Amino acid sequence: MQKQYFILLLIASFALAQTSADQFYREDQIYSSVGYPLLIDVPEALAQNKLSHTFSLGFVRDMPINVARNLAFGLGLGLNYNVVYTNLQFTDHMEAYTFVSSDMTNQWNYMEVEIPFEFRWRSSAPSNYQFWRVYGGLVGYYNLFAKQRTRTALIDSIASLSVQKFRLALRLNIGNNTWNLTYTHPIDSFFDFDKSTHNKLFSQLKIAKLGLVFYIF
């Protein structure tokens, strides 16, 4: 009989602990996204080709601000890697440029640390795992590296790109359950021409991102 009481006590304790934990639940703290980078504020002759892509993975600390815990702030840290295929090739340490022919492959590869700060609304509850969400805010970027790679049948060359070390952008994530759209609109220009070149034609070029974001936990 004592053994049965002990088991019941354990079950009751677990249930109370679970209820307490549910009352303080957090949502959507680990994220991954895939998307398409979009060049904006560019001359007409500049074009994207092939399948440019971007990928990110990160963690956002969810900080609820109301009793229902469906309103929250989020502050996070992540990494993103980007490949942009374009006909714009910089030469002579970005002092000059050319538009490459269709038989050449020219791409910009760059990786960044991203720091998102979000205001979050969702229709969630402790036992509801399928809900609507709208998350919007700012994201800061710190560039780790940026390279240009140009390939033909005979050559394969890699050169550094001079880009802004720190940039800001606006971000909006909206969706339901698994499928969520994400759009990032840049505030700052991508390249850093003040230090690298006198060529100002592409000084206002920015890179937006449109894709899908998945919340793992």
Language-model-detected regions and their locations in the chain:
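Short glycine/proline- and aromatic-enriched beta-strand/turn motifs that initiate or cap beta-hairpins
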Residues: Q18-D62, K209, V213-F217
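Extracellular/periplasm-exposed beta-strand and loop segments of Gram-negative cell-envelope proteins
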Residues: P43-K50, V84-Y110, N143-L170
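Transmembrane beta-strands of outer-membrane beta-barrel pores
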Residues: V34-I40, L77-Y85, W121-S123, L138-A146, ...
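Predominantly the C-terminal beta-signal and adjacent terminal strand-loop region
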Residues: S20-A21, Y25, L39, S160-F217
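Short loop/turn motifs that connect adjacent beta-strands in outer-membrane beta-barrel proteins
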Residues: T19-D28, P64-L71, S124-W132
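Sec-dependent N-terminal signal peptides
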Residues: Q4-F14
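Glycine- and aromatic-enriched membrane insertion/assembly motifs of diderm outer-membrane
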Residues: Q29, A47-S102
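Residues on the lipid-exposed face of transmembrane beta-strands in outer-membrane beta-barrel proteins
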Residues: L57-M63, L77-L79, V113-W121, G136-G140, ...
